[in-house]
Amino acid sequence: MKTYITLTIYLLYIVLLFNCKNEKQETVVYNKPNILFILSDDHTSQAWGIYGGILKDHVKNKNIKRLANEGVVLNNAFCTNSICSPSRASILTGQYSHINQVYTLREPLPDSHPNIAKTLGDNGYQTAVIGKWHLVKQPEGFQYFNVLPGQGRYWDPILKSKDNWKDGHDGSVGKVHKGFSTDVITDLTIQHLKQRDVSKPFFMMCNFKATHEPFEYPDRFKDLYNDIDIPEPQSLLDFGKGTGGRTFVGQKLENLEARWEEAYRRPNEFWTSYPGLPFEKEGLDSIGLRQKIYQKFVKDFMRCGATIDDNIGKLLDYLDEAGITDNTIVVYTADQGYFLGEHGFFDKRLIYEESLRMPFVIRYPKELKGGQRIDDIILNIDFAALLADYAGIEKPNYMQGESFRENLKGKPPKGWRKNMYYQYWLHEPKRPAHFGVRNDKYKLAYFYGKGLNKYGASKEDTPPTWEFYDLQKDPKELKNVINDTVHQSIIDTMKEEIKKLQSQYNVPSDVPHFE
C-alpha cells in the first residue's frame, strides 16, 4: 500500500511540474506564422561578426550567431537609398523612394499610403511597432504603436503612442521610460506580446535606435575594448577626393571629431551628447589623429552594438518560453550599412559596399534549414513581399519588390535579378546625389550632383562624374577604373542596364539623364 501511495504522489508531482513548466506557453490556434521583425539603425555588416572582416573576432554577437546558425543569412542584401527614413519607408512599402515619396529625412509617407502592416492587418494579423519610427507622421496600419520622436534619445527615452501623438520629431510629448533605449524597447516589445490576443497571429516591429550616432552604451559595456587596439581598415588613411579616382570628399572621420569637440564645449546647445569625452588630441599629426578618432569611434559603435545582441537574446528567449518559436518568423536586419573608417569615412548614404550592403538573417524553423547562406541579390523593397508571401497573401500590386521565399530555400525563381538599381537623393557637395547599378562582378555609379528641390538637399550643384569598380579584383573599391579602356564594353552595357532599370522602376523624368 505504501508503495502504491508513493508512486501516486510521484506521478502527481511529475504532472504538476510539467504543468508549471508550461503554464506560460501558448496554444497556437491559427495557421499563419507570427512575424517578429527586428530592425536596428546603422548596425552595419562589418560589426555583426558573421560576415568576416577585421572586426569579426571583437564584436559581441552570441545571439546574432545563434540566429544565423538557426536561420538563413543573406550575403547580398542591399538597400535602395542608404539613409534612415527612406530605407524604412522602402521596407514598409516595398517601393523605391520616388514611389513612396520618402526621399530624404523629413518627408512622411503620404496619407493612406499602402504598407505591409496595413496588408497584414487586413488579413487577420495584429500589428504593432515599438521603437524608432522616423517617418514624421502617425504610423498607419499599426493597431498599436509606441515610438521614439525623431531619432529619440539613448537614455530615458520618450515614446509616443496614440494617446499623446503629435506629428513631427517633437519630443515634448510622450512618456519617459527610464533606462537605456535598446533595453527599454525590448522590454516594451515583450510586454506588448504578452498582452496581445493569442488567438491571432502577430506582426511586431521592434525597432532599435542603436547603433545610430552618437553610439552610446549602458554601463555594463563601458570597459569593453579598453585594453586593446582594434584593427584598422585598409583604406583608413584615405585622406580625400582624388584618392583612387574618387570624385568627391565624403564624410571624413575628422568631422566626427569636430562634433565631439563641439558637444563637449557647448553641451547645452549641441544637438546630442557623446560618451567618453573629452577627446584629447594634442601633439598628434594627421595620421595619428585619424587613428585615434577611429579607435574611439569603432569601440563606441561596437559597445552600442553589444546591447543589440543582448536584447536579441531576450526576444528569442521570450519566444521559447511562450512556446511559439516554431511558428514565428524572426528577421533581424539594419536599415542600411555604415562606414567604420573605410575610405576614412563614417556615416552612410553612398553606393559603396559598406553603406549599400544590408546585413540580414531570418529564422523560420517550420520551413528554413538553419546555417544556410544565400548569394542572390535581395533588396529592401523585397522584404514586404516576402512577409506577405509567408502570410499567404498574393503580392499586392503596390509592391515593386519580389518575394524571395524560394531563394531562402536555395531555389531562386527563373529570371531572378542579376543587377540592382540604387539612387541616393539627399545631395550635398561632399556626398553628391547619384544613382547606379551593381551586379556580382561590377559597380557603375553616376554622381549627377543635383538636389532636384528635395527636402534638405543642397542647391549647390556639382559636376557630373562616373565611377566604376571591378568588385572581383577590387572588392574594397579603392580604384575607380572608369577610364580604363579594357572595361569600356562592360561600362556601356551597364549604362544600358541603368536605363532599363530606371524604366522598370518608373524613375521620374526630372532625374538627370546621360548619353
Role assignments for model-derived ranges:
Residues 2-4, 8, 20-466, 475-496, ...:
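Formylglycine-dependent sulfatase
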